[in-house]
């Protein structure tokens, strides 16, 4: 890790020593102490430059400075300079990244040219100062300086440092005094001070001058001001004056480029700009390169030594030429040099040895302030002029969690800059830099536009550099003394002798041969260097163009108009208000555009763009569509459809409630460059419990997703208020009679019963009705429609009545059908309009050309949704700036930086100790679709709160072999006493949504607790309520400055490969083996040999469409040729059935976008009703998508918009149930918000009303738990009556076809189970329909119940498709949140426990007749009873098969119910997949499924023909399910990510595969199931469990507080429309499954106390009737039955005792 350690020197005295070496962990000081203002440890917000340069200068304490005897000087008085006892020689220390230490010489050239580029930038800044001084940014800088002066800003991310005015005055006065002594020929004693880097400059106006550079001030300018800055800093006036350099005498004809072009510096002084100070330029002599992580190496020392000797040799040769200067002066100076970072692109106009241009003996005493700024590098100017220039470098890295942050460029820019503006604010998501908390100024971007000439400045001086190298001999005569005395580097040795010349001459002779070898080597490297420079210059030229094309800088924005920032209040008291919106343009000018509360962000953007264009501000090559608006200073972005009213509301509620709302200030920025900003959605506040949705992932992914949604929304069909009734997809059952009766509700509460034939349509029935009423109430049958009573659906007049699902189900179950006649006008004209639009759409689809995929027989895009999804936006690649990942053959390398907050995350609790012997390590693994591709672990470090690795981990997987969609998982593990503990993990997608491998930014991610999950989420733990561990890492920069992207078109790439077109030869034996593999279930794992065989037979598999999943599992995803060929096969693969395509949504295929697209095209074959069945799994599959903007998400939303009535509610509530799940909350919020944004307004309002109602019921259910049991009913009634916010009309969440009105408080109560659910009753909107009852549950996870009920519904669908109707009663249940949900109440039903208890208490469980007698009581005629027995037989067969296959446990008689029509059904599915309950270590449930003797008795006995029919039905149903075993396995696999306790891994699904017995034929399976039937009947433990349960809950089962028996037949006939009995389906897992102590009333009716008295007589009468019937039955039974009855009585007595 690149740690930043900043040493800031304040008021350093002359006797103080300076630091000369900086390594990665500390500052090493010399012998003498120094005053350190502050030392900062590394910070995650610090952005570390890869190259830091430390320029050092010091003087020699040598008295002998007269070594040039050949010089014709008039007077040479060399005095001793005793400023500092430091013998450090002039040098430059470069702190270089290890990865950049490849070419030392290129780095030296890099440094030289970087300095000149900086000079040119500063000159340009000064020339444009008049223009910049009036800008808002410069004013902000002035305010920043004032804060520095007042010590109100801490040391962090400071970009500009200005010296004190008093020091500048003193310095200027001393310089003026020294300039008066220019004609003296004496060398003056100079008091040298700590100045900054000296910029070389010269002019040719004066030929003879004495150069005296005197500095008498001690000015230490700090790049990072600290609170310890001296208080005598006083800035009175900020004016910049130009400094002209002194002119040096030339004796040669040529001049260097530097001499031709004087450098200009900056000084802040109270003097007038016309006043000038003359200074003398100096150059840098020696350069040493140091690996900053390891200190100086031997190569460094040798290179430094050879450089010094080479320059001394050149100087000696110049001395022999006899070229003399008329004046020789020794100018001593102390330089305070700050760490700078040159760009990695070397300019071409600084070459050769241009460092010996001065004719002065310069002894330098260096005070080093090696301060590495957190943004870039900084250079401070000579003569106490300090200006920190921020630059963005090619290899620059800034901290982020998802992608690199934007950066801003301070007042200057250079062609080497990466071009991205740099934020002054250094804050990240997790850390806020200190200046952010001190001053609001730094929150705004600060980038000044450079001039066009600066950006496109061509370097035309390359050819003149070498010509100037030999023209400086005349200026080098007097430099020999300096070079001979100062060549010893401070890092190598310190000479305290006054005679350095002899030592240096000795070194020259000793290393002469080494120098020659070096020169020869340099000659050979010249060509290579020229190539490198040429390449870099080309890259620089591209970057220059990108500066403008990307919109970072403006092309000479000459417009002077600026609308200003005058604020005005927003009149929020008005419902519709208007205001002016201030928009900041990229050129930093402002425009004002009109807006209102309803104006969208997009409309403001368009107005701002038009206004900016009109005023001449926007001269960009980028189009308007590439820009978006960001909220100024808040890092917040809104979707383009967000109205301004929502923005103001968000500001008041969530940002600054106390601030008075004024003008809205937005900034026009490039959409692609948004990274730190948060995308806030404000249009679904009510849906998200009043909280805005804030996306923290890639904003471009979300914005792209919203754009696609807008296209899909245009295809949505208009929704009618009253949808058509659902048609049954199955043929009419054979059991339906030829004639049936329909009861029609007419006008004014009239009712008419009609006898209909099975071939009647709704219109023919309406015609018959009009004929019967023509004398009393005549009407036109064409102007009326039939509505299903109680359900908001109308019957299409042209369809047969038996094709309507509702009518068929009613005939089968009850035989009672209720319809309501309504006038067509009351339904509105929406129906007619809808029919007309449907006809138009059908005509357009017929005329539209259908796009084929390579073959007419392949899938056709016959849907507008798929046409939209097929428009894949391929990213635009700039070939010069991008490189394919297939060309990078290096291994994936990641640098593990550090991890912190380990203690706060309670990691020691996971380990079980906080022993110091614990060691931590990180496992870095690359996965694709859950398959491990490569892994590598880090070194072990000691356990502490903050752990630093700073280690490169080489993952043994080449970048070229990484598939698109691969993820890297980092797992933090602890080792203690040989055991490994998994502390946390996080997943990171290697290629982003644009296919870019982001290697140019460090990442900091929050860990999820536990072990690495290869198919888990790829977002970090942003929503953690506890402090999560933060881990930081970065990838290696492979091809800087180019970006690595995944190959966009692999198919085209492999098509060019001539060697890849050979077809493999497959033998017949291999084909047979392949067919056997294809028949294996989805849980079958292919071994290596089978994978190779499948891939070899890939074209044979093409003839077997079901082999697709096996083929995709056989692809070697690290081989791009195989991947490309697999994609090519997908293009021509036959279309799979929608059910088979579900397997392709498995997490093991989720990382491949192409597979996802093919699966979606197959799923589009489903009807809306089939899609509703699989909606739960499809929503769960979205969790595994690569990005939000996935084809599956768009497909589902598009299909939902096509049919809101059927799919809208299931889709929304499945999303909302998991919206608080931390791993997927962001994705599901994105989907739900996008879905509702473009959904019809009435649907949005409906969801709001439903959420409001549920919130009221949930809060009431929580409060009622604290109320005593006997007062709960009254408490519930009173609270519901007093509740004023209840919506008056809403749809039922689990069945939106039912519209309900107000709640009925007197019919609501709390149930007496542990979770205290609420029994609530609503009034139906249809006056002819009975009230609707449901159970509102809180504190229970209903997801397992929902999954089981869904699988039961799927089984019923499969059976009906095979013409097998088993009369399944599948009630509806929906989860509305975490631990909350609604359950449908099944009317006219009773639990088996209550029926048995009513037949004799505990002994009733051992009797055979209770259920049969109960059915006879409610079906008085023999015909109706036989119908009830038939329904009981079929439904019992269905549930026997279903409960056995699914392994449903906890099957006692209180979880089995029967309705009065004979339908048996199960409730409470808290245990499945073989998780049966145990007691004292023994399994209580021994039987394969529940089939007790009393059930068999109802069927007709074991020897009856009806029982044989029952057995045959069971076997048939079992074989039908077995033939679709892969569907159930796929559905369970898609549910692995839900977190259901009993469905964690594939091992749980193995139970399901075992129960299917796929190894048997249908005949063998039938025999196998027959054995299970007889085994279940003969298992006595089932009956004993029933008896024990009755005994445990006897009080509730027989008490008056519980539900009564169903009324007599006469009472049922009197109240046909009203249910005589209701049952409570309380599916609490903890109540019914885990607790046997508190289940008193979970599945029964609970009468109020007022009903006890009325029901007492009825109970006694019913008991007498039951006794009489039992007597008759006992008389008619044989001896065995009598014996059984006696045994039952004995068992009852023993149990009672």
Curated annotation (Swiss-Prot):
PANTHER family: PHOSPHATIDYLINOSITOL 3-KINASE 3 (PTHR10048:SF48), PHOSPHATIDYLINOSITOL KINASE (PTHR10048). Residues 1304-1581 form the PI3K/PI4K catalytic domain. It is an enzyme of class 2 (transferase). Residues 1060-1238 form the PIK helical domain. Residues 888-1036 form the C2 PI3K-type domain. InterPro entries: ARM-type_fold, C2_domain_sf, Kinase-like_dom_sf, PI3/4_kinase_cat_dom, PI3/4_kinase_cat_sf, PI3/4_kinase_CS, PI3K-type_C2_dom, PI3K_accessory_dom. One of its GO terms (biological process) is phosphatidylinositol-mediated signaling. It catalyses: a 1,2-diacyl-sn-glycero-3-phospho-(1D-myo-inositol) + ATP = a 1,2-diacyl-sn-glycero-3-phospho-(1D-myo-inositol-3-phosphate) + ADP + H(+). Residues 1466-1492 are annotated as: Activation loop. CDD domains: C2_PI3K_like, PI3Ka_I, PI3Kc. This is Phosphatidylinositol 3-kinase 3. Sequence repeats lie at residues 1622-1626, 1627-1631, 1632-1636, 1642-1646, 1647-1651. Belongs to the PI3/PI4-kinase family. Keywords: ATP-binding, Kinase, Nucleotide-binding, Repeat, Transferase. Residues 1447-1455 are annotated as: Catalytic loop. The gene is pikC. Residues 57-91, 169-229, 244-279, 310-376, 398-428, 440-504, 1609-1697 are annotated as: Disordered. Its EC number is 2.7.1.137. GO terms for molecular function: 1-phosphatidylinositol-3-kinase activity; 1-phosphatidylinositol-4-phosphate 3-kinase activity; ATP binding; small GTPase binding. Residues 1659-1672 are annotated as: 7 X 2 AA tandem repeats of K-E. One of its GO terms (cellular component) is cytoplasm. Residues 737-823 form the PI3K-RBD domain. Residues 1626-1681, 1688-1697 have a biased composition (Basic and acidic residues). It comes from the Eukaryota.
């Amino acid at each position: 890790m690149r740690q930043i350690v900043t040493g800031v020197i304040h008021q350093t005295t002359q006797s103080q020593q300076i630091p000369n070496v900086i390594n990665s962990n500390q500052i090493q000081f010399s012998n003498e102490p120094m005053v350190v203002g502050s030392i900062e440890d590394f910070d995650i917000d610090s952005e570390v430059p890869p190259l830091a340069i430390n320029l050092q200068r010091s003087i020699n304490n040598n008295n002998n400075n007269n070594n040039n005897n050949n010089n014709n000087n008039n007077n040479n008085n060399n005095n001793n300079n005793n400023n500092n006892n430091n013998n450090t020689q002039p040098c430059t220390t470069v702190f270089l990244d290890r990865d950049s230490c490849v070419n030392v010489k290129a780095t030296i050239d890099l440094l030289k040219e970087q300095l000149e580029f900086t000079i040119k930038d500063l000159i340009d800044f000064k020339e444009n100062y008049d223009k910049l001084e009036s800008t808002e940014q410069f004013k902000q800088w002035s305010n920043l300086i004032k804060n520095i002066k007042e010590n109100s800003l801490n040391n962090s991310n400071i970009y500009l440092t200005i010296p004190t005015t008093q020091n500048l005055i003193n310095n200027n006065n001393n310089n003026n005094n020294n300039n008066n002594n220019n004609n003296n020929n004496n060398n003056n004693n100079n008091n040298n001070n700590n100045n900054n880097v000296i910029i070389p400059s010269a002019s040719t106006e004066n030929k003879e001058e004495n150069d005296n550079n005197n500095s008498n001030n001690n000015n230490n300018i700090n790049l990072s001001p600290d609170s310890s800055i001296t208080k005598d800093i006083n800035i009175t006036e900020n004016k910049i004056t130009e400094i002209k350099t002194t002119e040096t005498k030339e004796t040669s004809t040529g001049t260097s480029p530097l001499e031709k072009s004087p450098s200009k510096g900056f000084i802040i002084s109270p003097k007038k700009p016309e006043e000038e100070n003359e200074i003398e330029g100096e150059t840098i002599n020696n350069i040493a390169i140091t690996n900053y992580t390891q200190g100086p190496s031997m190569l460094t020392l040798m290179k430094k030594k050879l450089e010094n000797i080479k320059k001394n040799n050149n100087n000696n040769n110049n001395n022999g030429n006899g070229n003399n200067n008329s004046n020789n002066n020794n100018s001593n100076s102390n330089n305070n040099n700050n760490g700078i970072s040159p760009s990695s692109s070397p300019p071409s106009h600084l070459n050769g040895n241009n460092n010996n241009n001065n004719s002065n003996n310069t002894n330098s005493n260096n005070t080093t302030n090696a301060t590495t700024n957190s943004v870039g590098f900084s250079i401070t100017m000579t003569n106490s002029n300090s200006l920190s220039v921020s630059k963005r470098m090619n290899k620059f890295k800034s901290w982020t969690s998802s992608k690199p942050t934007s950066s801003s460029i301070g007042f200057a820019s250079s062609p080497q800059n990466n071009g991205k503006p740099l934020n002054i604010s250094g804050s990240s998501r997790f850390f806020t830099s200190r200046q952010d908390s001190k001053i609001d100024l730094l929150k705004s971007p600060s980038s000044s536009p450079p001039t066009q000439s600066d950006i496109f400045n061509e370097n035309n001086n390359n050819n003149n550099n070498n010509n100037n190298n030999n023209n400086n001999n005349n200026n080098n005569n007097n430099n020999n003394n300096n070079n001979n005395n100062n060549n010893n580097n401070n890092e190598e040795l310190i000479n305290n002798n006054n005679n350095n010349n002899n030592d240096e001459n000795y070194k020259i002779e000793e290393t002469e041969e080494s120098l020659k070898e070096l020169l020869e080597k340099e000659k050979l490297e010249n060509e290579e260097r020229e190539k490198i420079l040429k390449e870099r210059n080309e890259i620089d030229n591209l970057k220059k163009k990108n500066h403008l094309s990307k919109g970072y800088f403006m092309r000479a924005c000459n417009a002077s108009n600026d609308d200003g920032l005058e604020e005005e209040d927003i009149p929020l008291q008005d419902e519709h208000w208007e205001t002016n919106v201030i928009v900041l343009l990229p050129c930093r000018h402002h425009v004002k555009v009109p807006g209102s509360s309803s104006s969208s962000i997009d409309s403001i953007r368009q107005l701002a763009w038009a206004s900016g264009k009109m005023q001449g501000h926007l001269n960009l090559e980028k189009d308007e569509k590439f820009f978006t608006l960001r909220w100024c200073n808040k890092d917040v972005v809104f979707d383009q459809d967000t109205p301004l009213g929502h923005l103001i509301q968000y500001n008041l509620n969530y940002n600054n409630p106390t601030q008075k709302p004024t003008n809205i200030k937005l900034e026009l920025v490039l959409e692609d460059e948004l990274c730190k900003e948060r995308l806030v959605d404000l249009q679904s506040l009510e849906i998200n419990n009043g909280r805005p949705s804030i996306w923290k992932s890639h904003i471009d992914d979300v914005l792209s997703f919203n754009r696609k949604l807008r296209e899909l929304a245009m295809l949505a069909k208009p929704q009618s208020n009253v949808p058509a009734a659902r048609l049954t997809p199955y043929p009419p059952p054979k059991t339906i009679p030829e004639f049936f009766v329909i009861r029609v509700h007419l006008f004014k509460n009239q009712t008419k019963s009609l006898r209909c034939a099975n071939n009647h349509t709704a219109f023919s029935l309406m015609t018959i009705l009009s004929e019967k009423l023509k004398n009393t109430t005549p009407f036109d049958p064409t102007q009326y429609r039939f509505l299903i009573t109680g359900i908001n659906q109308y019957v299409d007049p042209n369809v047969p009545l038996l094709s309507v699902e509702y009518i068929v189900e009613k005939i089968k179950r009850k035989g009672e059908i209720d319809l309501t006649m309504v006038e067509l006008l009351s339904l509105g004209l929406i129906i007619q309009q809808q029919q007309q639009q449907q006809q138009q759409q059908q005509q357009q689809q017929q005329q539209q050309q259908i796009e084929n995929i390579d073959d007419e027989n392949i899938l056709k895009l016959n849907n507008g949704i798929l046409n939209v999804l097929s428009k894949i936006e391929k990213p635009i690649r700039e070939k010069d700036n991008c490189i394919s990942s297939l060309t990078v053959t290096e291994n994936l390398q990641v640098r593990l930086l550090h991890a912190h907050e380990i203690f706060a995350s309670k990691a020691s609790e996971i380990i079980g100790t906080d022993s110091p012997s614990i060691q931590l390590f990180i496992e870095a693994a690359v996965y694709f679709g859950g398959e491990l591709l490569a892994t590598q672990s880090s070194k072990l470090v000691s356990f502490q709160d903050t752990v630093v690795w700073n280690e490169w981990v080489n993952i043994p997987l080449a970048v070229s072999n990484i598939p698109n969609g691969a993820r890297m998982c980092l797992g933090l593990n602890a080792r203690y006493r040989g055991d490994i503990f998994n502390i946390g993990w996080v997943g990171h997608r290697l290629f982003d949504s644009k296919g870019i491998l982001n290697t140019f930014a460090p990442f900091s991610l929050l860990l999820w607790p536990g072990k690495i999950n290869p198919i888990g989420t790829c977002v970090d733990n942003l929503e953690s309520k506890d402090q999560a561990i933060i881990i930081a890492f970065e990838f290696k920069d492979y091809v800087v400055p180019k970006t690595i992207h995944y190959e966009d078109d692999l198919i085209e790439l492999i098509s060019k490969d001539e060697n890849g077109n050979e077809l493999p030869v497959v033998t017949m034996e291999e084909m047979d083996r392949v067919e056997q593999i294809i028949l294996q279930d989805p849980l079958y794992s292919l071994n290596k040999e089978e994978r190779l065989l499948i891939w070899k037979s890939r074209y044979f598999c093409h003839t077997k469409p079901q082999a697709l999943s096996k083929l995709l599992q056989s692809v070697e995803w690290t081989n791009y040729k195989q991947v490309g060929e697999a994609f090519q096969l997908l293009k021509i693969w036959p279309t799979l059935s929608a059910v088979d395509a579900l397997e392709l949504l498995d997490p093991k295929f989720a990382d491949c976008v192409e597979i996802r697209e093919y699966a979606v095209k197959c799923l589009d074959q489903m009807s809306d009703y089939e899609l509703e069945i699989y909606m739960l799994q499809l929503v769960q599959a979205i969790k595994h998508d690569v990005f939000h903007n996935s084809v599956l998400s768009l497909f589902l939303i598009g299909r939902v918009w096509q049919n809101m009535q059927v799919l809208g509610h299931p889709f929304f509530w499945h999303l909302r149930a998991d919206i608080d799940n931390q791993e997927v909350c962001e994705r599901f919020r994105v989907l739900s918000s996008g879905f509702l944004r473009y959904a019809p307004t009435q649907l949005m309002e409906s969801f709001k009303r439903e959420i409001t109602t549920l919130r009221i019921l949930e809060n009431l259910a929580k409060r009622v738990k604290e109320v005593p049991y006997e007062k709960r009913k009254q408490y519930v009634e009173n609270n519901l009556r007093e509740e004023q916010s209840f919506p008056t009309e809403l749809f039922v969440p689990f069945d939106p076809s039912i519209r309900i009105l107000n709640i009925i408080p007197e019919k609501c109560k709390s149930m007496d189970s542990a979770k205290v659910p609420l029994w609530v009753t609503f009034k139906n909107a249809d006056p002819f329909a009975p009230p609707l009852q449901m159970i509102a549950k809180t504190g229970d996870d209903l997801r397992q119940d929902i999954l089981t009920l869904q699988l039961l519904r799927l089984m019923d669908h499969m059976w009906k498709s095979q013409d097998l109707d088993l009369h399944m009663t599948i009630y509806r249940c929906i989860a509305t949140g975490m631990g909350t949900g609604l359950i449908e109440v099944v009317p006219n039903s009773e639990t088996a426990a209550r029926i048995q208890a009513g037949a004799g208490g505990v002994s009733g469980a051992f009797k055979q007749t209770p259920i049969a007698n109960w059915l006879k009581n409610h079906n008085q005629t023999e015909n109706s009873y036989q119908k009830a027995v038939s329904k009981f037989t079929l439904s019992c067969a269905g549930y026997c098969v279903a409960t056995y296959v699914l392994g449903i446990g906890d099957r006692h008689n209180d979880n089995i119910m029967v309705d009065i029509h004979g339908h048996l059904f199960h409730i409470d599915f808290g245990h499945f997949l073989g998780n049966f309950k145990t007691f004292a270590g023994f399994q209580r449930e021994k039987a394969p499924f529940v089939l007790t003797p009393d059930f068999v008795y109802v069927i007709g006995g074991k020897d009856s023909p009806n029982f044989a029919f029952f057995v045959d039905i069971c076997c048939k149903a079992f074989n039908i399910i077995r033939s679709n075993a892969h569907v159930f396995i796929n559905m369970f696999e898609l549910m692995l990510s839900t977190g259901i306790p009993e469905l964690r891994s594939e091992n749980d699904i193995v139970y399901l595969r075992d129960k299917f017995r796929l190894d048997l034929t249908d005949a063998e399976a039938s025999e196998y199931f027959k054995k299970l039937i007889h085994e279940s009947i003969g298992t006595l433990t089932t009956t004993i469990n029933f008896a024990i349960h009755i005994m445990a809950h006897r009080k509730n089962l027989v008490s008056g507080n519980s539900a009564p028996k169903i009324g007599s037949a006469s009472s049922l006939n009197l109240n046909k429309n009203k249910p005589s009995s209701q049952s409570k389906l309380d599916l609490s897992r903890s109540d019914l499954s885990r607790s046997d102590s508190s289940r008193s009333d979970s599945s029964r009716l609970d009468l109020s106390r007022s009903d006890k008295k009325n029901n007492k007589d009825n109970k006694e009468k019913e008991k007498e009737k039951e006794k009489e019937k039992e007597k008759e039955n006992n008389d008619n039974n044989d001896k065995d039955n009598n014996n059984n009855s006696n045994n039952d009585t004995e068992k009852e007595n023993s149990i009672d005792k």
